[in-house]
C-alpha cells in the first residue's frame, strides 16, 4: 500500500466523539488507582535519628513500669519467696538498670563504629563488657 500525503483540513469547531477501539470489559480489567493515595515513607534511618534525638532530650523511663516490676519480682522469687518491694525501691532499680543499659549500648555502638559497621552485634556487647572489666 502506497503512502499518501496528508493535507491540513479546516476544523468546523464542533467536537466529534472519538471511537473507542476496545470494548468495556477490557477497560474494567485494569484497577483504577485514582482514589488511592500512596502512603508517605521516610528514608531509612531518618526515623531512627529522630528517635535518638527525642530520647536524648527526655529524662523519662524507657522501660514500662509494670513489665519491669514483674521482672524484678520474678528474679527475686528465685532467691527468696514472699518478698515485698517499696515503690521507691523498684523505681531506684529501674533508674539504675536503664542507666547501665544506655551506657552499655553507647559503648557497644562505639565498638561497632570502630569495626566500620553501623549495626551492633553480640560481639560488640561482649567487647564493651570486656573493656569495662565486667567480664573476663
Swiss-Prot record:
Stored Pfam families: Histone
Residue pairs linked by disulfide bridges in the UniProt entry: none
Bias (Polar residues) ranges: 23-36
SUPFAM superfamilies found in the cross-reference section: Histone-fold
Keyword tags: Acetylation, Chromosome, DNA-binding, Methylation, Nucleosome core, Nucleus, Phosphoprotein
Sites bearing N6-acetyllysine, chain numbering: 5, 10, 15, 19, 24, 28, 37, 57
Keyword Transferase: no
UniProt similarity note: Belongs to the histone H3 family.
UniProt subunit comment: The nucleosome is a histone octamer containing two molecules each of H2A, H2B, H3 and H4 assembled in one H3-H4 heterotetramer and two H2A-H2B heterodimers. The octamer wraps approximately 147 bp of DNA.
Protein name: Histone H3.3 type b
Organism: Dictyostelium discoideum (Social amoeba)
